[in-house]
Swiss-Prot record:
Its main location: cytoplasm. One of its GO terms (cellular component) is cytoplasm. It holds the Pfam family TACO1_YebC_N. This is Probable transcriptional regulatory protein A1I_03240. One of its GO terms (molecular function) is DNA binding. It comes from Rickettsia bellii (strain OSU 85-389). GO terms for biological process: regulation of DNA-templated transcription. Keywords: Cytoplasm, DNA-binding, Transcription, Transcription regulation.
């Protein structure tokens, strides 16, 4: 699979999430509630809930909050209902962006997403306008020190994974959506809770951003999109060049 993000770019996005932990937890709970309402409280026969729980655990959502979310969703008095929507568009420089959202007000969310794209010179397109530039698949990440690349590769293949990439910080395992839960369970038994585990959009190829102004505008757009309570995840087919990353490292836009 082409277009793997460099570890520094991954760490930038993860750092932003770490600084907004409460908001991340809120989004994880929303996905759990939606999964239960769409299926059942039993993850064994509810693949979406199984995936939501795996993602929640990888982000260290406390067990008591997970249990509370499941019980709340199963309560007949709970009238929370969220619709899953995917927005697609282009950021400046032809960068393809996919935004996944869960919302109880589609008009509000569409207006927020469109406003974010417009503010930073992007264009919101129709659903399907950029997804052909990505592969929809499972992503599981472990820190490099958990095991050697050879051992991770052997275990991942045995588990049924499609691909694995190891860099200076992370082992990243890619799976078919259908095999995601099985592969994650196998790896969890072997290596413990993953650092990241989710179903997302991985770019088939990436565009290298080597201009400071373009990088700042792009990252501000992504951060603004992620600020929305309705937005679950944002994906893009870009990487920061080493030079641009070093220039921006330590700035508010990277550390925010």
């Amino acid at each position: 699979m082409a277009g793997h993000s460099k570890f520094k770019n991954i760490q930038h996005r993860k750092g932003a999430q770490d600084k907004k932990r409460a908001k991340v937890f809120t989004k994880l709970i929303r996905e759990i509630v939606t999964a239960v309402k769409a299926g059942s409280t039993n993850p064994d026969n509810n693949p979406r809930l199984r995936t939501a729980l795996a993602t929640a655990r990888s982000q260290n959502l406390p067990k008591e909050r997970i249990d509370k979310a499941i019980n709340s969703a199963n309560d007949s008095a709970n009238n929370e209902n969220y619709t899953e929507i995917r927005y697609e568009g282009y950021a400046p420089g032809g960068i393809a962006i996919i935004v996944e959202a869960l919302t109880d007000n589609k008009n509000r969310t569409a207006a927020e997403v469109r406003s974010s794209f417009t503010k930073y010179g992007g264009n919101l397109g129709e659903t399907g306008s950029v997804n052909f530039l990505f592969k929809h698949c499972g992503v599981i990440q472990y820190p490099l020190e958990i095991s050697s690349a050879e051992n991770i590769l052997e275990t991942a293949i045995e588990a049924g994974a499609d691909d694995i990439v190891s860099d200076e910080v992370l082992h990243t395992i890619y799976t078919d959506i259908e095999n995601f839960s099985k592969v994650l369970e196998f790896l969890t038994d072997k290596y413990g809770t993953a650092e990241e585990a989710y179903i997302g959009w991985v770019p088939l190829n990436t565009i290298i951003i080597d201009d400071k102004e373009k990088a700042e505008k792009l990252l501000k757009l992504v951060d603004l999109l992620e600020e929305s309570d309705d937005v679950q995840r944002v994906f893009g087919n870009y990487e920061l060049s080493d030079e641009i990353y070093e220039i921006l490292q330590g700035s508010e836009i990277i550390c925010k």
